[in-house]
Amino acid sequence: MSNHTHHLKFKTLKRAWKASKYFIVGLSCLYKFNLKSLVQTALTTLAMITLTSLVITAIIYISVGNAKAKPTSKPTIQQTQQPQNHTSPFFTEHNYKSTHTSIQSTTLSQLPNTDTTRGTTYGHSIDETQNRKIKSQSTLPATRKPPINPSGSNPPENHQDHNNSQTLPYVPCSTCEGNLACLSLCQIGPERAPSRAPTITPKKTPKPKITKKPTTTTIHHRTSLKAKLQPKNNTAAPQQGILSSPEHHTNQSTTQI
């Protein structure tokens, strides 16, 4: 764009110079014809035109010089660089090794742990695989939490009591024979928990007993033919027939025959 504008300005200057030439030729012709008043006016106008053209050219050259002095590319914004901690690789490796040594020392110091709820001492065996895991981790290990009692019978203990109980060793009471210090430690130490969990036997629900109702036996007595043939008004005769014995029935049958 800047080259195009300069080219247009150069063309306009050429045209102005040509017009001034034609104007000068015209003035010379008028001077030959003894027209002094017209010549004076024309010379004054020519002087004004030349002065204006000189001013315009001076402005153009100054603007072109400033454009060449300035870079055409866009101004680059300098980013504010944040202060970085330029540490040497030896220093970082030294810090890395020191952190691993501190981690290993803390793990070795936490080997003899005592469980307050069960009172058993145990030691963590460190293998090569554990050492590799410790080296790979850069953060410190989390503090060991006490195991949760599944039965929930024991109340929750304070954190200070837990730390104090870890520092004191467990001494069995069987080894103390008349030693007061040993007996005091034996009393303070936690009780030994059973090796096996108690087996819970499920209770059998008793089945409800079904009581049978007693069966009533009905005795059917034979009625005689007379009792059947008697009219309904006579109520005493059928009762006698019902209450009569089987021998009486046989006698009646023989008499009828």
Curated annotation (Swiss-Prot):
Q: Which GO terms describe its cellular component?
A: extracellular region; host cell plasma membrane; membrane; virion membrane
Disulfide bond entries: 173-186, 176-182
Ranges facing Extracellular side = 67-257
- One Pfam family assigned to this protein is Glycoprotein_G
Q: Name one GO biological process term.
A: symbiont entry into host cell
According to the record, the segments passing through the membrane are: 38-66
Which residues point to the Cytoplasmic side?
1-37
Q: Which residues are glycosylated?
A: 72, 80, 85, 87, 92, 105, 139, 163, 199, 215, 233, 251, 253
Q: Which InterPro entries match?
A: G_prot
Q: Where is the composition biased (Polar residues)?
A: 73-90, 98-123, 150-166, 231-243
Site residues (Cleavage), renumbered to this chain: 65-66
Residue numbers spanned by region Disordered: 70-166, 193-257
Q: Is Iron-sulfur found in the keyword set?
A: no
Identify the keywords attached in UniProt to this record, alphabetized: Disulfide bond, Glycoprotein, Host cell membrane, Host membrane, Host-virus interaction, Membrane, Secreted, Transmembrane, Transmembrane helix, Viral attachment to host cell, Viral immunoevasion, Virion, Virus entry into host cell
Region listing for Binding to host heparan sulfate, in residue ranges: 187-198
Please give the family membership noted in the entry.
Answer: Belongs to the pneumoviruses glycoprotein G family.
Its recorded name reads Major surface glycoprotein G
Q: Which organism is it from?
A: Bovine respiratory syncytial virus (strain Snook)
> What is the gene called?
G
